[in-house]
Amino acid sequence: MIQVLLVTICLAAFPYQGSSIILESGNVNDYEVVYARKVTALPKGAVQPKYEDTMQYELKVNGEPVVLHLEKNKQLFSKDYSETHYSPDGREITTYPPVEDHCYYHGRIENDADSTASISACNGLKGHFKLQGETYFIEPLKLPNSEAHAVFKYENVEKEDEVPKMCGVTQTNWESDEPIKKASQLVVTAEQQRYNHYKYIELVILADYRMVTKNNGDLGKIRTKIYEIVNILNEIFRYLYIRIALVGIEIWSNADLSNVTLSADDTLASFGTWRGTVLLKRKSHDNAQLLTAIDFDGQTIGIANIASMCNQNKSVGVVMDYSPINLVVAVIMAHEMGHNLGINHDTGSCSCGGYSCIMAPEISDQPSKLFSNCSKQAYQRYINYYKPQCILNEPLRTDIVSPPVCGNELLEMGEECDCGSPRNCRDPCCDAATCKLHSWVECESGECCDQCRFKGAGTECRAARSECDIAESCTGQSADCPTDDFKRNGQPCLHNYGYCYNGNCPIMYHQCYALFGSNATVAEDGCFEFNENGDKYFYCRKQSGVNIPCAQEDVKCGRLFCHTKKHPCDYKYSEDPDYGMVDNGTKCADGKVCSNGHCVDVATAY
């Protein structure tokens, strides 16, 4: 018999108004105090693991009771996970620590379908959860003989008043610089577009010597930070059907093994070369990210090679340890890995339902865990075009568990599924006794799969995102939603204020809204004449690194000008050459759209 015991958090809901406290996450000026008491729920007589597979907590947030459900992230580590550091005389020291009974969880809030959670339960509860659309952080208070925790919002963490930080990627596209009609002519098969089937990235994270000195030589603190970051990465990338397996970390505890300089570009190039010539020879993996404590020149906090996943010297990124809040660093790393997966920076016409999206070139006031519609489309195109083999297939498990053991919840050679023991199996498609799919199973996952069977023909599987898009429906013969299609490019939309372009209706008003907020409108025509200057800020396009001035008829296809409370000719500029420019496909005159810095007839543009 299973003895079910509640896990309770008793809350004293009294925010310390006007006071502040120094936590690992920084100086917090408004928080609530939570007292946690945990009791396990196990079969009678069972050996209690240090950290249970599932846990439940009851707590109050803003005086309202909530129930937090947590489930251990069993796919966080690969079974051949290793850790490497270096002795003072430079000797490589590699260990293979046991990681099965780890303390990193994902979760949700009961009765809140949009909720998420990423929590470390190693020493109290540390992490974040999303409740009713708002993100809260929880962290243990360092009080003697106390189980007190602080609950607070990101906005209550004091931040330095500094210029906005940016991604250092300036390459605008991994595809050829062809006319914009190329995107509308993409043709992919149903098999090629199976981007919604899970991919697996085997990740190695390296910490440079500055990370060691920043943390006073405490390698355990660096390891914990990396674990929490990767746990968050898994939460983020599941929306792209990607799982991140940490196969190793390496800490340059004695000296940097590649050049880490103030130049982010040089650091990336050196790290990529070292990864391809040294690291890959001793540790199999798909992607490597360098976590550094250096403060790069300019506004850069991260950089990566675009469309480079699986490439020997280029499947890398460099991320600055910009914040003590691990969610912020994880979002930066997710951004750079997004570039590795062929995703470019978001423009004004991209949206994710939040204030900002992961691939925004400038770090947001509120860290976002959401990829935009543009990011999802770019990732799908990349998968279809490049077919990066190292992530298309689930990693072989021969190096993880051998021989295969049915019932251990690991999919191994010879198994079609593995949902655990017959008592614990929750997968209706899987026969837990044999680790084979039931004979009647038609599918396991996909937008057109429900309870192991294909959804009926005509069932909508992808809603139209705009009047320029087309809703897709299941065929009844496949688990996959048909290829994302959209209305003909150049068709008028939004009451003739714009023309359809790849399923969207890009107009300047929406782009101003995205850049400056709801009070912004499109500036007067005279503002756009600045684009004839061809200087650092105002131009139509770049050619061989040179800013090309706009011809008079093209001025509305260069820098975007918006009327704001601050200025009638307001604009945005950053190191990213696309940021703040008028989006391709935007109406620039009656019957004309922007195409690579030119205002051309809509009939010839597509």
UniProtKB/Swiss-Prot annotation:
Family, per entry: Belongs to the venom metalloproteinase (M12B) family. P-III subfamily. P-IIIa sub-subfamily.
Residues that coordinate or bind Ca(2+) 2: V405, N408, L410, E412, E415, D418
GO terms assigned for molecular function: metal ion binding; metalloendopeptidase activity; toxin activity
Motif D/ECD-tripeptide location, chain numbering: 467-469
Location in the cell: Secreted
Extra information: The disintegrin domain belongs to the long disintegrin subfamily.
Protein name: Zinc metalloproteinase-disintegrin-like HF3
Organism domain of life: Eukaryota
